């Protein structure tokens, strides 16, 4: 590599024989996390756990300004007996210049805004109570806002890099989540 452009090198977890991307499980044109949730209800061997995890991923995507939340970045791992589990998260790319819009909408028929309010309104569809959802969003925001700078420093980020990426982690939606504890 000869460029000064930032890159990420990750070790991928998947075994191609046991992982299928969410977009391959149906011929329907998805566009919403609630569509993925419907599939989880049909195929998961632990649907409530997977629904909770999917909702947390929505909030995480919002809080880190993930620019790569399209359907091809959601998958399932074969769990045996014709059952599946939501795969570990992958292809998460914080983007400081990210428009506050998601690639995958939260609720069918809703906007594609990267909105904590919409995620909280949808929590019951993902089998979370509003109280639990608010608490989880707060804890996630607190962890992200408190730790992102050190995490980047630990990976060799410069002060300029930190300034560049600040808007990906510290923005209106992360502040809303932090206010949930008040």
Give the location of each predicted region:
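Anionic ligand-binding catalytic core segments
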Residues: 1-71, 75-182
């Amino acid at each position: 590599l000869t460029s000064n452009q930032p890159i990420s090198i990750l070790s991928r977890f998947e075994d191609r024989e046991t992982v299928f991307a969410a977009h391959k499980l149906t011929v329907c044109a998805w566009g919403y996390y609630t569509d993925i949730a419907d599939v989880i209800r049909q195929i998961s061997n632990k649907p409530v756990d997977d629904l909770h995890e999917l909702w947390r991923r929505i909030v995480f995507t919002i809080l880190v300004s993930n620019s790569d939340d399209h359907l091809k970045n959601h998958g399932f791992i074969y769990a045996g007996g014709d059952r599946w589990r939501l795969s570990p998260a992958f292809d998460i790319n914080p983007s400081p210049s990210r428009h506050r819009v998601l690639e995958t909408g939260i609720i069918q028929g809703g906007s594609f805004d990267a909105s904590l309010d919409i995620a909280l309104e949808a929590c019951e569809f993902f089998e979370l109570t509003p109280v639990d959802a608010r608490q989880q969003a707060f804890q996630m925001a607190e962890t992200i806002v408190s730790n992102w700078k050190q995490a980047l420093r630990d990976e060799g980020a410069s002060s300029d890099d930190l300034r560049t990426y600040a808007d990906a982690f510290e923005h209106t939606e992360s502040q809303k989540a932090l206010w949930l504890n008040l």
